[in-house]
Amino acid sequence: MSQRRHFKMSVTAKNFYRRPLPETCIEFSSELGKKLFTEALVRGSANIYFKLASQFRTQDEPAYCGLSTLVMVLNALEVDPEKVWKAPWRFYHESMLDCCVPLENIRKSGINLQQFSCLAKCNRLKSTVSYGDNSPDFLKKFRTSLVNSVRSDDQVLVASYDRSVLGQTGSGHFSPLAAYHEDSDQVLIMDVARFKYPPHWVKLETLQKALCSVDVTTKLPRGLVELELKKGTRPLIMYGLKAYVNINDSDFATSVISWNQFLLCDPLEDDEEEFQLCCRKFGQCFAPHAMCCTQKTFDADQKNSCTECSTDQNEACKMICSEIRRTRFAEVFSSSAVAALLIAWPFEKGYSERSDRIGNLAEKYKNEFSAETMNEMNQLTTQIRTLISCSKPPVVININKPDATSNKCCKNKIGQSCACANDVNL
């Protein structure tokens, strides 16, 4: 006689197979959903759908809606990351979006609208953020942006919204918008949490309300992000900021504040001493954050080795490295990555005499660089500027003339030299 085995299922383990859509949403695969899509397609208001559908993905982690949405958009817009995902393929994956916010933090808490935009900019996308509000003007602008996006094949509109306003479970969520049905004023949401909800149509006014929900982490409304590839660019292939540098990195924020305060001080009378002082101060602030993208270690960069570039990038890497090392900045720094960071620094004209001097020298070199090196500097400037603007605590570069009495050292108080010189190891 056979024995029957009894298996017990834990009563504490709660799990779900998807969620039913609320009445506010129309399932994409329903008869009505198909009808709405067909009519939108005939009117040319679903062009971007095909690019998005070809890269439609399910978020890898419960809190990865923002990352997965961005990966979907990057691949849909055919952005070459010029990084290998799985050999030999170059393709965007969530694990490759390792700037702005630590991946471990995102896995736990997700990202907000500002962080999403930061990641987009660091990956060569034009990113325009519109925070939600309930005004008719916002709804009109929303509709215009949506129509422009869905009728194109190179612009994507992403919504950061509150699910609960749509009658769904959960709160903050990201997903791209793929089609618009004009007669019913409904938009197709390509929900990246496909394990929870399928793609669905929703009234534009309803989604507008969901965009107005305040994100508790930023105290700002959610909203929209218009994304488009910056044409004629390539990603950073030689230099960059280390992966741990992100908008929550207080060390980086502190370094930026210290550097900005240094720039406010009076320059030294001797030009060579002033140049050396500025370079040493910058190195003190940012050498720990600078990285040569082709090297595994700081020592390798010091040895001027570019052997780890991929074959198709090798010549470009060598050219960029060579041009940076021919500058006066590289004569001071042991790492060309720090020199590149200084040359690419987003100096604001008129910020201070010291800032203008060092900024003008950096600009002189940039004007002499090849197209490859200039692209590298422009991309690095974008990365730096984006991280500065998003840093917590906020790092604000005030381009207006600062209050000299509160922020600036006075020569007559410290002999004939800038007080900040005492803080820099020459």
From Swiss-Prot:
Expression by tissue: Expressed in hypodermis, pharyngeal grinder, pharyngeal-intestinal valve, body wall and vulval muscles, and coelomocytes. Expressed in posterior pharyngeal cells and anal valve.
Keyword DNA-binding: no
Protein name, as recorded: Glutathione gamma-glutamylcysteinyltransferase
GO biological processes: cellular detoxification of cadmium ion; detoxification of cadmium ion; detoxification of copper ion; detoxification of mercury ion; detoxification of zinc ion; phytochelatin biosynthetic process
Activity control mechanisms: Requires cadmium for activity.
Peptidase C83 domain ranges (all copies): 11-232
Keywords: Acyltransferase, Cadmium, Metal-binding, Transferase
EC number: 2.3.2.15
Induction: Induced by zinc oxide nanoparticles in intestinal cells. However, not induced by zinc or cadmium.
Disulfide bonds listed in the record: none
Disruption phenotype: RNAi-mediated knockdown causes hypersensitivity to Cd(2+), specifically causes a reduction in growth, impairs development and reduces fertility.
Family membership: Belongs to the phytochelatin synthase family.
Functional summary from the UniProt entry: Involved in the synthesis of phytochelatins, which are heavy metal binding proteins required for the detoxification of heavy metals such as cadmium, arsenic and copper.
PANTHER family: GLUTATHIONE GAMMA-GLUTAMYLCYSTEINYLTRANSFERASE
GO molecular function list: glutathione gamma-glutamylcysteinyltransferase activity; metal ion binding
Gene3D superfamilies reported for this sequence: Phytochelatin synthase, N-terminal domain
Catalysed reaction, written as an equation: [Glu(-Cys)](n)-Gly + glutathione + H(+) = [Glu(-Cys)](n+1)-Gly + glycine
Keyword Transferase recorded: yes
Catalytic residues identified in the record: 65, 173, 191
